[in-house]
């Protein structure tokens, strides 16, 4: 099961609402975000909660529940805690924060879900992926380096490539979304809440890939 969710981004007000920080923006939008208690630790900010708490929050906020309206079932062998992490090392060194949590709590790479921006997916598309390439993403590169394997979960938010093919990619990912794009993303975030909850309460997130391997959440 997934035990650590790492939201990749850059720390600082100047990076708020930028394309590279789409994962942090997603975390901020979670209906149960105000339930999380953050601590500065492991070169980042970390919050922990039990799967049972998550199931109750998802039920209370109408993200996910059983047909009778009660909280979703938690697998019998679920871990006692799930951890949310926002590395504050800047994107290129995200792995330094992730590996501290992995080592401290004795996690395995398959227990890790990294949420990040994805140039190769259009805006409005999300993708749950196991392992694979890095797509030139420095946060993923850092994570692979410290885990010594590409075999970890990824939840990718499409940001698309710049309209101007000559635009520097570093400048593009550090630029802010337009107001219209932010409105689109709020819709995307609200639909992706269900995926995140299901992935964290699932014994095997691979069962979700057929539906969420590459899902377009907005109309053209």
Give the positions of each predicted feature.
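Hydrophobic alpha-helical segments within soluble ligand-binding/sensing domains
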Residues: 136-139
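Nucleotide and nucleotide-moiety/phosphate-recognizing core
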Residues: 1-131, 141-155, 162-168, 175, ...
